[in-house]
UniProtKB/Swiss-Prot annotation:
Keywords: Calcium, Digestion, Disulfide bond, Hydrolase, Metal-binding, Protease, Secreted, Serine protease, Signal, Zymogen. Its cofactor is Ca(2+). Interacts with SERPINA1. It catalyses: Preferential cleavage: Arg-|-Xaa, Lys-|-Xaa. The record marks D194 as: Required for specificity. This is Serine protease 1. Ca(2+) binds at E75, N77, V80, E85.
Length: 246
């Protein structure tokens, strides 16, 4: 999950966006069909993840925006055709109107599929949250992002990571002045486990509900620098209203 990479150079902290997706570091290979709501956003290559929330709509991160996107559903090994995948072009791509590319606030986006997906054991929707999650809640993060905190290793097979939501105070202390009321941190303060480049836009699912979207962080799996996600619970009304209007 990293739209931002923070580098400490000569005592200065520099933040800049990167055109890469987030990945899973320190996780494990997901079992086949265990994350049926996970989608791959493709523009000739996998560049971000997303979550199917009904047969025709996907939630992803606003920083994953491209003018043309093919949504790939039912994927497990993205390097080969395994049968059962569904490739559907995006008909509409709608970033949150208050998305801020500098602060990465409101980093959420909706994608309307040009035709409804066929729902089955490989492709199914994840529920939107009924309420916001408590600190300590365990969540599942998944994606095809980088699996190394230093260097690169992009897996073909979907990777998973279980990680807890951290308290707001821990989150704000990790990123002073950068955490809005719309954001939450999750992961491990000791480092070693995180999302990373290539996982951006992908799901953070807690107790069967989509509570987060892989968004940003300082590097990947670095000590004291957990992953940051928008709180999907803050956007349920916007999601429902946008779907109804489109």
């Amino acid at each position: 999950m990293k739209t931002f990479i923070f580098l400490a150079l000569l005592g200065a902290t520099v933040a800049f966006p990167i055109d890469d997706d987030d990945k899973i570091v320190g996780g494990y290979t997901c079992s086949r069909n265990s994350v049926p709501y996970q989608v791959s956003l493709n523009s000739g290559y996998h560049f971000c993840g997303g979550s199917l929330i009904n047969s025709q709509w996907v939630v992803s991160a606003a920083h994953c925006y491209k003018s043309r996107i093919q949504v790939r559903l039912g994927e497990y090994n993205i390097a080969v055709s395994e049968g059962g995948e569904q490739f559907i072009n995006a008909a509409k791509i709608i970033r949150h109107p208050r998305y801020n590319a500098n602060t990465i606030d409101n980093d959420i986006m909706l994608i309307k599929l040009s035709s409804p997906a066929t729902l089955n054991s490989r492709v199914s929707a994840i529920a939107l949250p009924k309420s916001c999650p408590a600190a300590g809640t365990q969540c599942l993060i998944s994606g095809w992002g980088n699996t190394q905190s230093i260097g690169q290793n992009y897996p073909d097979v979907l990777q998973c990571l279980k990680a807890p939501i951290l308290s707001d105070s821990v989150c704000r202390n990790a990123y002073p002045g950068q955490i809005s009321s719309n954001m939450m941190c999750l992961g491990y303060m000791e480092g070693g486990k995180d999302s990373c480049q290539g996982d951006s836009g992908g799901p953070v699912v807690c107790n069967g509900e989509l509570q987060g979207v892989v968004s940003w962080g300082a590097g990947c799996a670095q000590k004291g620098k957990p992953g940051v996600s928008p709180k999907v619970c803050k956007y349920v009304s916007w999601i429902q209203q946008t779907i109804a209007a489109n």
